[in-house]
UniProtKB/Swiss-Prot annotation:
The gene is nectin1a. GO terms for cellular component: adherens junction; plasma membrane. The keyword Membrane applies. Residues 143-238, 243-330 form the Ig-like C2-type domain. It is a single-pass type I membrane protein. This is Nectin 1a. Disulfide bonds join C41-C121, C168-C222, C265-C312.
Length: 496
């Protein structure tokens, strides 16, 4: 059949008559089952024109021609069985009383797999004779993708025995599909193809893995690739397994008189647990123990009576699982190392905050005291200098009639005022009387308004200011410090 098709194609792809007539067609067409497809056919009638007597569409079946549709100018249009309900001429002019047969394209509706074949469009002309061409129609079938678990529930078994957990089927596809698996499971697949009588192919792929609790609820995806199109379907594995049990609640710090302690039985199982049972290996359960399914509650304060080993048994339809815990009761609570570290860190933080607050308070206090003393001790112009007995000049800038002091008059803070006064009295240079300020009413005495005397009296420091008469008025305070150049400045200026 392939040889005949090839021969016909070589002869008829562009069959040109002696006068230039030919039939134009596409070499191949394709469609999916249930869809619609057009098979074009056009007649090129060159000069001189010829008369078209009839157009016949034929299906080539096993080397023989089977009529599909006929268009005759005199007899009209006819579509034969089994194509009558699904095949028609596309151009309405073909069906007119005076038809135009240059374009006799036919349309297939509800395409079937059996429609796949080679179709011939044949023109009968006068006087040129017959002209024809052919087209190959291919029909595709999209597969039905179905994925399922091997059984609704899979029971976990031996760790070395793999079993089929899921099956993916791409049924009745044309051409055949390619099946792959997408999953995190450590399994393998087995794929086989089955050819069907209608020319389609069914592909089946089974996935094998060792069923266990670890793969429960894992996703398994089947990917079917067909004609560069991908179809996916997924299932979630349902693995049944016996309970795996642990007991929580004992923290290693159950001490006498502790309140609200309990043990909880936690079980990982599929299906769920149907029965919980508690056992006390040291005898019967203590009187303070109360059973509430998976929880064992101890009422009242902790006593030595509840010490011992407790066992929880959990059961489901697949099997049973157990776990135990040994409860130890101590006289005093024990604090974990982590708690001690947290407390120590908290103490460091609190101590640091206290120290910082204390330092800040002390600094503020010192600052306030310093400012207050400074205000009490000196209120004047720091740039003021008092001449005293020895720089060779009077306050007005005149040369004094007496020689300058041979040395500076300097006193320490703790010098006795009587000694200071005696020293001044014994000096021949002074040559005058010394009087206390508060008893002196001489109008010739001029006190520089530094504010020292008044402020000292107001602050009650009991300090005395002495006035020395030597050509010009001079005042000296015990808080004033004589300098080498004969001037005297306050202690604050001296420190600066």
């Amino acid at each position: 059949m392939m040889f005949i098709n090839l021969l016909l194609r070589l002869m008829c792809v562009f069959l040109i008559g002696a006068d230039g007539q030919m039939v134009q067609m596409e070499s191949s067409k394709a469609g999916f089952v249930g869809s619609q497809v057009e098979l074009p056919c056009q007649f090129v009638n060159s000069n001189p024109p010829v008369k078209i007597s009839q157009v016949t569409w034929q299906k080539l079946v096993n080397g023989t021609k089977q009529n599909v549709a006929i268009a005759n100018p005199a007899l009209g249009v006819s579509v034969l069985n089994p194509f009558r309900e699904r095949v028609r001429f596309k151009n309405p002019a073909v069906r007119q009383r005076t038809p135009s047969l240059e374009d006799t394209t036919i349309v297939f509706n509800r395409l079937k797999l059996t429609d796949e074949s080679t179709y011939i469009c044949e023109y009968t002309t006068f006087p040129a004779g017959n002209r024809e061409n052919m087209v190959n129609l291919t029909v595709f079938a999209r597969p039905m993708i179905q994925m399922s678990l091997s059984t609704p529930s899979i029971v976990a078994g031996s760790k070395d025995l793999k079993m089929t957990v899921a099956t993916c089927v791409s049924a009745n596809g044309k051409p055949a599909s390619v099946i792959t698996w997408e999953t995190d499971l450590d399994g393998e697949s087995n794929t086989q193809e089955i050819s069907n009588p209608d020319g389609t192919v069914t592909v089946r792929s089974d996935y094998f893995v060792v069923p266990s609790r670890e793969i429960h609820q894992q996703l398994l995806t089947c990917i079917s690739t067909y004609n560069e199109e991908q179809y996916t379907d997924s299932v979630t594995l349902n693995i049944q397994y016996e309970p795996e049990v642990i007991i929580e609640g004992f923290d290693g710090n159950w001490y006498l008189n502790r309140e609200n302690v309990q043990l909880t039985c936690l079980a990982d199982a599929n299906p769920t647990i149907s029965l919980y049972q508690w056992r006390y290996l040291n005898g019967t359960l203590p009187s303070s123990a109360e059973l509430r399914d998976d929880v064992l509650i101890f009422k009242g304060p902790v006593t030595y009576d509840i010490a011992g080993t407790y066992v929880c048994d959990a059961t489901n339809s697949i099997g049973s699982g157990s776990a135990s815990v040994e409860v130890i009761v101590t006289e005093f609570p024990s604090y974990p190392h982590e708690v001690f570290q947290d407390q120590q860190q908290a103490g460091v933080v609190i101590g640091g905050a206290v120290v910082c607050g204390t330092v800040l308070l002390a600094a503020v206090t010192l600052l306030v005291v310093f400012l207050y003393r400074r205000r009490c001790m000196f209120k004047g112009d720091y740039s003021t200098k008092k001449q005293i007995l020895g720089n060779g000049y009077s306050k007005a800038g005149n040369v004094p009639s007496h020689p300058s002091l041979p040395h500076s008059l300097t006193f320490s803070d703790d010098s006795d005022e009587e000694k200071k006064l005696e020293l001044y009295r014994g000096s021949s240079i002074l040559g005058g009387s010394v009087q206390e300020f508060h008893t002196c009413h001489d109008s010739r005495i001029k006190a520089y308004r530094t504010g020292l005397i008044e402020e000292h009296e107001r602050c009650a420091f009991n300090e005395q200011t002495y006035i020395y008469e030597y050509g010009s008025e001079v005042e000296v305070s015990v808080d004033m410090i004589p300098q080498m150049d004969g001037s005297v400045i306050s202690k604050e200026e001296w420190y600066v």
